[in-house]
A protein has these predicted regions:
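Coupling and communication elements adjacent to P-loop NTPase active sites across diverse families
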Residues: 1-56, 69
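ABC ATP-binding cassette signature C-motif
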Residues: 39-236
Length: 236
């Protein structure tokens, strides 16, 4: 069945070949962003300089100073419970107000984005036509989804499979900015290098929170530590 789906993909969509390749390992993740709408490198997406800002009822920051340009990749670290995810969601909401910017969001809790009552194919499908569904099936097969996993409810998937589904969603959407909360946490040690490579090669801007030092070092150009006083640039 997989061979039939792959042959159909070749007929229907050459672009699909740019995005995924057949995995060599069971948990391999070989995805690629392509046909990307680049933002100017010097364009400011974010330029905050705010005193005594209340991010949430439990999070007040004395001085929030942060800028992000069109192709910049910034990581945020900090102690557990210091408010990294809350800050990231605040920045996501702020950036979402921009009408000329496309954003891909990967929260820690995938169910915020995934529609659990849909199948993976239905979730990724825009038109619902046969050729599109065959291309999507091929992408999912390349990510080691079984036929049942492709067609049953997303709620039945493991955390790792949900993570792969959300990665594929980001790749197919190809947004100009990615906001990623602990992007590597649900992936196996053998697939994490491929996830890091995907985001390192991503041609847009990234705002990310993570405890994964290897990921931060490989992907990010700047890293900030968050505490109640604000953000301080650090080396890790």
């Amino acid at each position: 069945k997989m061979k039939a789906v792959l042959s159909q993909e070749k007929r229907y969509d050459r672009l699909a070949q740019d995005m995924t390749q057949m995995p060599e390992k069971e948990d391999s993740i070989e995805l690629f962003f392509s046909h990307f709408d680049h933002l100017p490198q010097g364009k400011y997406l974010l330029n905050l300089d705010e005193k005594q800002i209340n991010i949430a009822p439990h999070l007040t920051i004395d001085h929030l100073k942060l800028s992000l340009k069109g192709q910049e990749k910034i990581g945020i670290v900090g102690d557990n419970g210091c408010g990294k995810s809350t800050l990231l969601h605040y920045l996501y909401q702020k950036l979402s107000q921009k009408t000329n910017l496309t954003i891909g969001y990967m929260p820690q809790h995938y169910d915020t984005i995934l529609q659990n009552d849909l199948s993976p194919i239905a979730f990724l499908s825009k038109t619902g036509d046969k050729s599109e569904r065959e291309v999507i099936s091929s992408h999912l097969a390349n990510l080691n989804f079984s036929h049942d996993e492709m067609n049953h409810a997303i709620s039945d998937l493991s955390g790792g499979q949900k993570g792969k589904l959300l990665l594929l969603h980001l790749v197919l959407e190809s947004p100009q900015l990615l906001i990623l909360d602990e992007a590597t946490r649900n992936f196996s040690p053998t697939s994490q290098p491929q996830v890091r490579q995907l985001f390192e090669n991503y041609p847009g801007a990234i705002l990310t929170v993570s405890h994964d030092v290897n990921y931060l070092r490989q992907v990010c150009q700047k890293i900030y530590r968050l505490d109640s006083r604000g953000l301080e640039e650090v080396e890790i």
